[in-house]
């Protein structure tokens, strides 16, 4: 299966911002999540706090959000940690939305967003103290190239934190290739060290719960954002038991 295109994601992001159904999904599935986050991913406030700790950020540092989408999780992290934020996404619609939404988090002066690819961010070498990627790395045309790009933009000892999935059974052929990634092997191959993979049941429970809540809301009528999530849920719920949600951490040399 080929990687989704920027045009595919433009359509998705256009639907998200106006979707009352998606807002309702998050109210029911993750009531602890601040409403302004409006994620295009499977995060709770507890998971974002875990990511913030793993990034080991200090106020005044720079965080790169790779595959930032509409910006919510990265903007939350910037607000909570006092860092500057640069978000990168290949969807111009997402970048426009993220730029606009920075004001909701009170970080307009410290956040900027640029159109770029996970494998070619156009950021300078050693630009960021840390990098985060929320449910995005597996969409790269080449996850290995994305890992190499993340290392390039990180300063020495910079932290990389990803949220994603891994198979319960390594190499499970029932799953698409992007859900079978061996994260430690991938990141070590890009030169990272101190690679860790953590899974907690509540992270995977949230993933499945978002899909079930979306389906239970019933007929989306003219809500294209909810309709898209329901279609995705029907495709992915049958394979949910084959994967686990993980937070992957690594350190640049």
Question: What role is predicted for each listed range?
Answer:
Residues 158-164:
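Conserved beta-strand signature within the Rossmann-like core of class I S-adenosyl-L-methionine
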Residues 196-253:
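Conserved Class I S-adenosyl-L-methionine
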Residues 1-32:
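N-terminal, positively charged/glycine-rich alpha-helical extensions of SAM-dependent methyltransferases
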Residues 144-156:
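A short glycine-rich, Lys/Arg-flanked "PGG" loop and its adjoining helix->strand segment in the class I
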Residues 130-142:
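A short SAM/SAH-binding and catalytic strip from SAM-dependent methyltransferases
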Residues 41-59:
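Conserved alpha-helix/loop element of class I SAM-dependent methyltransferases that forms part
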Residues 119-130:
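A short acidic, Gly/Pro-enriched loop at the edge of an enzyme's catalytic core
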């Amino acid at each position: 299966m080929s990687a989704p295109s920027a045009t595919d994601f433009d359509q998705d992001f256009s639907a998200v911002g106006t979707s009352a159904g998606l807002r309702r999904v998050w109210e029911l599935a993750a009531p602890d999540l601040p409403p302004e986050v409006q994620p295009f991913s499977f995060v709770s406030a507890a998971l974002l706090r875990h990511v913030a700790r793993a990034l080991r950020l200090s106020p005044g540092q720079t965080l790169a959000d790779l595959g930032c989408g509409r910006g919510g999780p990265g903007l939350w992290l910037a607000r909570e940690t006092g860092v500057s934020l640069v978000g990168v996404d290949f969807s111009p619609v997402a970048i426009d939305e993220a730029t606009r939404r920075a004001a909701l988090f009170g970080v307009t002066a410290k956040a900027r967003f640029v159109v770029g690819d996970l494998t070619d961010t156009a950021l300078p070498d050693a630009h960021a103290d840390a990098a985060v990627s929320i449910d995005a790395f597996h969409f790269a045309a080449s996850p290995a190239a994305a890992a190499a790009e993340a290392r390039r933009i990180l300063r020495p000892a910079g932290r990389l934190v990803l949220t994603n999935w891994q198979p319960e059974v390594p190499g499970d052929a029932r799953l698409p290739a992007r859900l079978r990634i061996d994260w430690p092997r991938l990141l070590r191959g890009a030169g990272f060290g101190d690679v860790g993979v953590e899974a907690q049941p509540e992270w995977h429970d949230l993933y499945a719960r978002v899909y079930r809540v979306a389906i239970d809301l019933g007929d989306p009528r003219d809500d294209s954002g909810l309709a898209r999530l329901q279609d995705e849920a029907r495709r992915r719920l049958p394979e949910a038991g084959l994967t686990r949600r993980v937070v992957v951490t690594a350190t640049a040399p």
